């Protein structure tokens, strides 16, 4: 075993991390031609990530643990767009309520072109910590996942980035629009690989 491993694990102790499986409930997220729902994949990867982080002594919170949205009752009669906004606002409120050090939002990508593939991180262009954390997680994803060669990118105008005071990174775990990748994203072993890569990226960032 690597001698530095205990030291690296220790960096997560006492850190409060909010894991946010994107979408849920009335919001399926991306849906591919085989009716794979992004919300389900997000939750499976997030739950595995929670296990890895909890074992390292971090204080872990989840925005959801079941197939539910986070629209408060007061907004449930609003138009869908306003419900989506309210759902995101609840996620931000949770990050503040838990006094989270980091908010990791787990998603899957999809575009009208089947050729694109790979897991990719996005960061808040106004937050240097968000950028550095996204780059560390991206580096880990590229190291752990065969053929993954994407780079961390800023994402302008994202509601989470514009409104969360917590250092936030969005992780798009792959493309549901790519048949081969969407098939892998359903496999527990691949979900574990993704979760492990995210976990190690966070470790590496904190160990720097």
Enumerate the language-model features and the residues they cover.
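Catalytic-site microenvironment of enzymes
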Residues: 1-208
């Amino acid at each position: 075993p690597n001698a530095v491993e205990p030291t690296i694990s220790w960096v997560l102790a006492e850190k409060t991390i909010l894991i946010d499986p994107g979408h849920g409930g009335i919001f399926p997220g991306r849906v591919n031609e085989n009716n794979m729902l992004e919300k389900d994949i997000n939750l499976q990867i997030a739950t595995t990530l929670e296990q890895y982080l909890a074992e390292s002594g971090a204080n872990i919170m989840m925005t959801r643990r079941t197939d539910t949205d986070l629209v408060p009752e007061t907004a449930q009669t609003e138009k869908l767009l306003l419900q989506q906004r309210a759902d995101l606002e609840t996620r931000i409120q949770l990050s503040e309520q838990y006094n989270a050090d980091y908010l990791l939002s787990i998603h899957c990508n999809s575009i009208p072109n089947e050729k694109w593939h790979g897991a990719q991180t996005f960061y808040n262009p106004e937050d240097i910590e968000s950028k550095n954390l996204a780059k560390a997680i991206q580096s880990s994803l590229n190291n752990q996942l065969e053929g993954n060669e994407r780079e961390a990118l800023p994402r302008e105008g994202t509601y989470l980035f514009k409104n969360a005071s917590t250092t936030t990174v969005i992780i798009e775990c792959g493309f549901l629009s790519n048949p081969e990748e969407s098939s892998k994203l359903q496999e527990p072993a691949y979900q574990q690989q993704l979760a492990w890569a995210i976990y190690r990226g966070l470790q590496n960032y904190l160990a720097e």
